């Protein structure tokens, strides 16, 4: 299956990385000052718990056809990874430790 992302992602991609976790692992627990991210689970599944300041929502990413956009103000936790889960993250900025809150 071929997935084309350039019309889905609403920003210029500056950084790409993968998160590969074992079951029971939790990642995130922060938000960013200026980075927007696109999350795609390219293998397996995981849940993204997101709080935008007004409401909390859980998103199941279980297909490479699903892309979740996280804005800088979104507090997020990535969890409930199944054993083969690989999460692709596309970011609007280069890595900067000072961008994390």
Tell me what each language-model feature is.
Residues 1-66, 84-86, 90, 96-99:
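Non-catalytic, conserved peripheral segments adjacent to functional cores
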Residues 61-81:
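Conserved metal-binding segment of the jelly-roll/cupin
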């Amino acid at each position: 299956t071929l997935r084309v992302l350039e019309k889905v992602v609403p920003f210029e991609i500056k950084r790409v990385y993968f998160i590969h976790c074992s079951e029971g692992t939790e990642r995130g627990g922060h938000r960013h000052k200026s980075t927007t991210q696109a999350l795609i689970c390219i293998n397996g599944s995981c849940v993204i718990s997101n709080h935008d300041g007004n409401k909390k929502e859980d998103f199941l990413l279980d297909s490479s056809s699903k892309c979740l956009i996280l804005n800088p103000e979104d507090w997020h936790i990535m969890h409930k990874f199944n054993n083969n889960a690989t999460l692709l993250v596309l970011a609007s900025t280069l890595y900067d430790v000072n961008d994390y809150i």
